[in-house]
C-alpha cells in the first residue's frame, strides 16, 4: 500500500518531466481508418442536439473502456448529444487497458487515435491515467484547456498524464492540481477495500448539477485530493463529500475513523486566451460506480451545466442505461478479471 502511494506521489512530482527521444519507443499504431479507431453515436431528439461531446477512455484500472461508451449512449439516446468515444490503443489499434503505466515501462508512449476531435468538441468528459503522450497529442489537450469549453474530469484525470510537454500559462507550468482544483495525494478510503457513499454539501444543495441527485454510491474509494500545503481552493465550489465505508457492500456502515472529503466540485478555469471554462471534477468514476443512478445523473447534469444549459436540467430527465451494462470490476489483475486487448467495435453496444 505504502509503495503504491509513493509511486503516485512521485508521479505527481514528475508530471512535467520531459523524456528524451531516446527513452521513448514510438509504436507504429494501426488506427484502422476513420470510424474504426473510435466510436460515434449520433444524437437523437433532445436538448443536446447540435452539441458534440467527446469522451476519453485512457487508463488501466477503472474500466473506462466500458463506462465511457455506456455514458455516450445515454447522452446520445436520451439527451440528443452527438458523442464520440476515444480510446488509448496498442500498436494493433486495439483498446488495451493492459498497457503498462510509464513507471512500469518508461519506454512506453501511449496513443489516443482521433484526439484531433477535441478541436471541434463542445464538451469533453475525460478519464485518463498516467498517459505518456506525444507532444502533438498533449498540445491538443492544452489547446482545449485554453478553449473556454467545459471539462468534466473523472477519477484519475487529476493524474491523467505522465511527463511530456508541459501546459504553460503566463510562461509558468500549470499542474493538473491547478487546472482541476485538486490532485491525487493518496487513497483516503481503503484501496479496493472501502466503498464510497456521497454526501451532498448542504449549503450547495441547490446547485444545478445536484438536481435530482438523491443517492451516490460506488465501490471506488475516496481520494485525498487536498492537504495542508494545498488545501481545498477558495475558487472551487464543493458539491459532494465522500464518506469511506467499512467494506465494498452497498449497505456497509461508514468508517467512522475517516472523515468525509470532497469528491465533486466545480471551478472556472481561465486559459491563455482569456476564455473561461467551466470545470467539474468528480473523483468517483469506475465502471461499477456508473451503475449507480446518482453517479450517472451528476455526471450528465455536469455536461448541461458546463455548456451553460442549466435551464435544461430536470430531475425527471432519464439517465437510464441504454442496452445491457454489466461492467467489470476495477483492478489490474487482468487475467483474473478477463480484461484483454479488444477491437474498438467490441465496445459499441
Task: Specify the residue positions occupied by each region the protein language model found.
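A glycine-rich, often tryptophan-bearing local segment used as a flexible ligand/cofactor-contacting loop or short
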Residues: 117, 126, 130-212
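Bacterial N-terminal signal peptides
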Residues: 4-18
Amino acid at each position: 500500500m505504502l509503495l503504491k502511494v509513493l509511486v503516485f506521489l512521485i508521479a505527481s512530482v514528475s508530471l512535467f518531466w520531459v523524456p528524451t527521444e531516446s527513452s521513448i519507443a514510438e509504436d507504429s499504431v494501426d488506427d484502422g481508418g476513420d470510424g474504426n479507431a473510435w466510436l460515434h453515436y449520433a444524437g437523437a431528439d433532445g436538448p443536446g442536439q447540435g452539441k458534440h461531446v467527446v469522451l476519453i477512455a485512457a487508463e488501466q484500472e477503472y474500466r473506462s473502456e466500458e463506462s465511457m461508451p455506456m455514458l455516450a449512449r445515454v447522452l446520445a439516446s436520451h439527451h440528443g448529444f452527438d458523442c464520440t468515444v476515444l480510446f488509448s490503443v496498442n500498436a494493433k489499434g486495439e483498446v488495451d487497458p493492459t498497457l503498462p503505466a510509464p513507471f512500469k515501462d518508461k519506454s512506453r508512449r501511449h496513443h489516443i487515435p482521433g484526439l484531433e476531435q477535441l478541436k471541434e468538441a463542445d464538451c469533453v468528459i475525460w478519464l485518463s491515467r498516467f498517459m505518456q503522450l506525444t507532444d502533438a497529442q498533449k498540445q491538443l489537450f492544452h489547446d482545449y484547456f485554453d478553449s473556454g469549453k467545459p471539462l468534466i474530469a473523472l477519477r484519475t484525470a487529476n493524474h491523467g498524464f505522465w511527463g511530456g510537454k508541459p501546459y504553460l500559462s503566463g510562461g509558468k507550468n500549470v499542474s493538473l492540481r491547478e487546472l482541476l482544483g485538486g490532485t491525487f495525494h493518496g487513497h483516503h478510503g481503503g484501496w479496493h477495500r472501502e466503498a464510497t457513499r456521497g454526501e451532498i454539501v448542504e449549503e450547495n444543495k441547490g446547485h444545478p448539477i445536484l438536481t435530482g441527485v438523491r443517492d451516490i454510491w460506488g465501490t471506488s474509494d475516496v481520494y485525498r485530493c487536498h492537504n495542508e500545503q494545498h488545501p481545498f481552493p477558495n475558487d472551487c465550489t464543493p458539491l459532494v463529500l465522500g464518506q469511506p465505508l467499512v467494506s465494498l457492500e452497498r449497505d456497509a456502515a461508514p468508517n467512522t475513523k475517516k472523515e468525509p472529503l470532497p469528491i465533486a466540485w466545480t471551478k472556472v478555469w481561465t486559459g491563455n486566451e482569456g476564455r473561461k471554462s467551466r470545470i467539474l471534477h468528480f473523483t468517483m468514476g469506475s465502471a461499477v460506480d456508473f451503475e449507480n443512478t446518482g453517479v450517472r445523473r451528476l455526471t450528465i447534469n455536469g455536461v448541461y451545466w458546463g455548456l451553460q444549459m442549466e435551464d435544461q436540467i430536470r430531475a425527471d430527465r432519464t439517465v437510464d442505461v441504454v442496452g445491457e451494462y454489466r461492467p467489470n470490476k476495477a483492478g489490474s489483475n487482468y487475467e483474473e478479471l478477463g480484461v484483454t486487448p479488444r477491437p474498438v467495435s467490441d465496445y459499441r453496444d
